[in-house]
Amino acid sequence: MSEDRSAYPFSTFLDQHSGQLNASDVPPELWHSLYKKLSDQTFDAGDHFQIICEMNEDDEKTLFVRALEDLHNNDEDNIFLIDHFMSFSSESARKCVESTEGLVERLAGLFGIDTDSTEEVDETVEKIETSVEKEEAEHAKKISSETGNLPRHESVDARLSSYSVDDPKNELTEKVLKALWKYSQTYSVSYQLDNGEIEKKSVWYVMDDFGTRVRHSTEPNVRIVPLMFLPQNCAYSIMFLTKPVNTDEEIMMDWASNVITAQHPEWRKYIEQPWAAQDFSKETMIPDAPTLEYFTSGRNPDFLAGPTEQQTCQSAIFTSLPILKKRKIKVYADDTQLTEHLKNHKVEYVDDIKKADVIWMIKHFHDYKQLSEENPCGMINQFPFESCITVKDLLAACAMRDPAKNDWYQLTYNLNTQLPEFVARFQNRELNGQHNVWIVKPWNLARGMDMTVTEDLNQIIRMIETGPKIVCEYIPRPLLFPRPDNGNKVKFDLRYIVFLNGIAPVTAYVYNRFWIRFAINEFSLSNFEDVETHFTVFNYLDKEKILQMKCENFIETIEKAYPRIQWSEVQKDINLTIRKAIEAAAKEEAPRGVAPNVQSRAMYGVDIMLQHGDNDVIKSTLLEINFMPDTTRACQYYPDFADTVFETLFLDEIDPTKVTPI
């Protein structure tokens, strides 16, 4: 492409890529040489380095890379392109490996894994284009042109799999999949959705035979970082020296270099587990209590009304309530999805918070002190510091304050603050043959997004590179539902709408109707990458896979399938679980907990899963609590839903046929 450089000048390259290069700490003196090599597609690492294969006395093969000549890190030409052999997402790794003919054997050769295959594995590995790479290329174009929804991966019913661990091919597949988390790296790409929002997706990749054979060291002499080359909508890795290298010296990189290692250098031995395994099973599994900074770092503070203002507001709301019931309700709203469905109550929208009876906001509100002073009669649909309920890592911190007494939330660790304790727990369970399947969740994304179910410690450790995560014990024995449409016994979860009217004491109600989300495939504790087996929330492309069922029909089916179950008893346990969660989140003073505020009311979407407990008793487990849940289906199914919301939260009209106190 050298003749085309005039059409793509260096200045344009800098405009498009300087942000990436600076973020990766690529020395500026190397940028022009990188530009030329990318433009000309010059892969010249083979002119300066050599892949070496050594066999020990046990015929075990070791692959590494050494320099063919003296090289200096200040030489502007000493920056090298590395191609990517394959790309995948964490949930699609197995599908990519199993569905591409010959890929298992080729990856085994790339990773230096012995194979009993009679077919000779070619040591020179050509690039494999997986479905993820095709998607990646298409979506990269959409960054600058069109918008589009993210794809979801195909799924295979677990019952249709002829998988057998005794099959040599499957044994090799498992070795390759485990090795992926030693030899893969990651970057993220941004997509613009139809609604204009920007969404990030993590892409994992394996470098070509050269890059893969650069071994790990805590004293590296090169760095290898990914770069998205925008003119081609294609990702490469680039390698540059961090110190001079002598002839025949092995080149090595720090595979464990990431944000968490930089923040917690004392954790390096845990983060290095994929490359330098150690036994931590005897170390403590109990993390320290979260600090005050844990609850405040990176979050905007809420300003609380004092006791005098609270008392004034309580009196003002009590006095104004009879008047409010007789006239239009003045509403300040930044979203009208719910309020436009009010039928029994007339609304007048106002654009000044000080004039509103009800403040209904999706945007987070912070100044409760100012509200108490300027509008003591007003009520708002948020509580101060309610992130302790609605944000995954903070809810987990509240739930895990006394894990021995916690029977409503799965054992959870924050990988960004409690990684050593989690590694010890995982290895201790592995040593004792205990259930050891975990689900990795991002702190701040909707359910089903960037989640991974796995029993691979190395994979879990690597997941911290794609953003803040918690890891929860996976429910091994969920109550299953017999789907009438496909006959599968599937996982499900329940979405409840909960109204919180007060914190001290807890005053809360649950809407008497709930919604059910079903998985698609037969449940089994295998094939953890299959989203349609292990997840219940995803964006369907195939609408025929959606099973909609009203709660009355669901209860009837469950009681018929499980004659020992009385739903009324299950519902009592669910209500108790929800109350325990709210009490745990409000147990300590703000910012370590939700703060009481007489002007506050809130509606939450609470997700519950049922599982078999001791003596096969059905027990409820809380998954998460969502701020301002989507009420589209609720308003469609139940035309009086919006009125019930306002009557319960703001008008003190509690209808026991619609809601139940918890």
From Swiss-Prot:
Amino-acid positions noted as binding ATP in the UniProt annotation, renumbered to this chain: 472-475, 491, 493
Pfam family, one: TTL
This protein's GO CC annotations: cytoplasm; endoplasmic reticulum; sarcomere; striated muscle dense body
Keywords: ATP-binding, Nucleotide-binding
Gene3D superfamilies, per database record: ATP-grasp fold, B domain (3.30.470.20)
Domain named TTL: residues: 324-660
Keyword ATP-binding: yes
Leader peptide range in chain numbering: none
Reported consequences of knocking out the gene: RNAi-mediated knockdown at the L1 larval stage causes a reduction in egg-laying, likely due to a defect in the egg-laying apparatus muscles and in hermaphrodite specific neurons.
InterPro entries hit by this protein: TTL/TTLL_fam, TTLL12
Domain of life where this protein originates: Eukaryota
GO-annotated biological processes: egg-laying behavior; protein modification process
GO molecular function, one term: ATP binding
Transmembrane segments: none
Family: Belongs to the tubulin--tyrosine ligase family.
Protein's job: Regulates microtubule dynamics in uterine muscle cells.
Stated name of the protein: Tubulin--tyrosine ligase-like protein 12
Organism: Caenorhabditis elegans
Chain's gene name: ttll-12
